[in-house]
Amino acid sequence: MKEVIDTVGRRKTSVARAFMIPGKGRVIVNKLPIEEYFKDEFKRQQALRPLVITERAEEFDIKINVQGGGVSGQSGAVSLAIARALTEFDETARVILKTEKLLTRDPRMVERKKFGRKKARKRFQFSKR
């Protein structure tokens, strides 16, 4: 078995690399404790959901580097990276995580702005006369 498990998770434009080693349950995101990095409780819970569901929150130390996007995309990317690391460590966790849809890369991306329009779908105000 590998000493360090290295995985990647993506969501929107965010990319998270997770390095998982056996430890005491510390989670560090961009050199900050996860409580400081994700100040919003919901985003923190979303990021740590794979650990909570598999009941392995106290077994591993996880160091995460995350870049790009906003807070929501980053927490989704962190969640996917952690879920992939857990399955690499223990295949039995795969079934649990798959039923919770935590191993699925969310394909939704921001739709591009089109020319002749205000945003991707919103049009400029139309005047009949």
Swiss-Prot record:
MF annotations from Gene Ontology: RNA binding; structural constituent of ribosome
GO cellular component: cytoplasm; small ribosomal subunit
Gene Ontology biological process terms from the UniProt entry: translation
Source superkingdom: Bacteria
Pfam families per record: Ribosomal_S9
Keywords: Ribonucleoprotein, Ribosomal protein
Family, as annotated: Belongs to the universal ribosomal protein uS9 family.
HAMAP family: Ribosomal_uS9_B (MF_00532_B)
The protein's name: Small ribosomal subunit protein uS9
